[in-house]
């Protein structure tokens, strides 16, 4: 194979060498700061909020109010696009009986800075602090929702917290496992402790639901099972037959949203 054809594989290998390497940030995050919806285009009852992470970076969030509910869901999206491209998901989630606090990672949409693993964990902590300390929600009335790379923020944040529940959609288990999936097993030992979902989930106290498509080629369902198997709290695993990585909430909407609705109702009732 010509050297130029091998270049992407070398770049991916470099990405996986260490969580501190800028290359991992380059390949792991694909922020979009250009697609911004005007306020009048947002769902009714949506408030734009800004708060600061502990390192001073200004972070944006959208709060979809739900006056008929005393619970709220902090939502962490995937690695591409931004919060404005997921408005339909937020609307659907609110219709299930929860307020929604959708967080824009640093470097995405109107948030300042550049994304990194450590940085998005700071953003998650700051979001939780804002929801509890400024908005006044007690932890037992808060759900945390993470999809794809957002599962890493959600899991990191949920550790040891007395929250209502954790929802993980298509979660990765670790950078090490992702390296193997990409055919870069030789680099797996060098990934350190990057994105260690399966390790961190052991410190989860709250109920957990993991949702994964059986035909996910980006983060295979085996990773979701690894995360699920490592959890020791009350837990549920739901596989959606035939679903891939990016079509769960639309093509398989009926099944997907029913699972989430049932989990919200059951977990909130028990708190």
Model feature map: region roles:
Residues 225-229, 233-271:
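C-terminal catalytic histidine-bearing segment of alpha/beta-hydrolase fold enzymes
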Residues 17-52:
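An N-terminal hydrophobic leader/cap segment in hydrolases
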Residues 137-148:
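Alpha/beta-hydrolase fold nucleophile elbow
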Residues 215-219, 246-247:
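Acidic catalytic loop of the alpha/beta-hydrolase fold
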Residues 203-205, 210-212, 216:
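Short beta-strand/loop motif that positions the catalytic acidic residue
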Residues 151-206, 254:
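Hydrolase active-site cap/lid region
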Residues 54-130:
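Membrane-embedded segments
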Residues 89, 197, 206, 220-229:
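Short alpha-helix in the alpha/beta-hydrolase fold that links the catalytic acid
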């Amino acid at each position: 194979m010509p050297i130029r054809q091998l270049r992407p594989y070398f770049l991916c290998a470099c990405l996986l060498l260490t969580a501190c390497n800028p290359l991992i940030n380059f390949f792991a995050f694909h922020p979009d700061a250009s697609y911004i919806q005007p306020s009048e285009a947002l769902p009714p009852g949506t408030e734009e909020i800004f708060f600061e992470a502990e390192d001073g970076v200004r972070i944006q969030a959208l709060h979809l109010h739900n006056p008929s509910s005393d619970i709220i869901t902090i939502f962490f999206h995937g690695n591409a696009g931004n919060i404005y491209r997921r408005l339909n998901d937020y609307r659907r989630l609110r219709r299930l009986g929860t307020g929604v606090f959708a967080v824009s990672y640093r470097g995405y949409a109107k948030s300042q800075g550049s994304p990194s693993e450590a940085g998005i964990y700071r953003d998650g902590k700051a979001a939780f602090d804002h929801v509890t300390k400024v908005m006044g929600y007690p932890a037992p009335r808060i759900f945390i929702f993470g999809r794809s790379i957002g599962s890493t923020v959600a899991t990191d944040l949920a550790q040891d917290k007395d929250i209502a529940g954790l929802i993980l959609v298509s979660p990765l288990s670790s950078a090490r496992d992702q390296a193997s999936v990409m055919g870069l097993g030789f680099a797996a030992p060098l990934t350190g402790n990057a994105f260690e979902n399966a390790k961190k989930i052991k410190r989860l106290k709250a109920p957990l639901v993991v949702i994964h498509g059986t035909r996910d080629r980006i983060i295979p369902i085996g990773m979701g099972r690894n995360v699920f198997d490592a959890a020791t709290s009350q837990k549920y695993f739901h596989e959606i037959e035939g679903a891939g990585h990016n079509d769960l909430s639309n093509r398989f909407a009926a099944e997907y949203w029913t699972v989430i609705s049932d989990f919200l109702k059951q977990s909130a009732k028990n708190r």
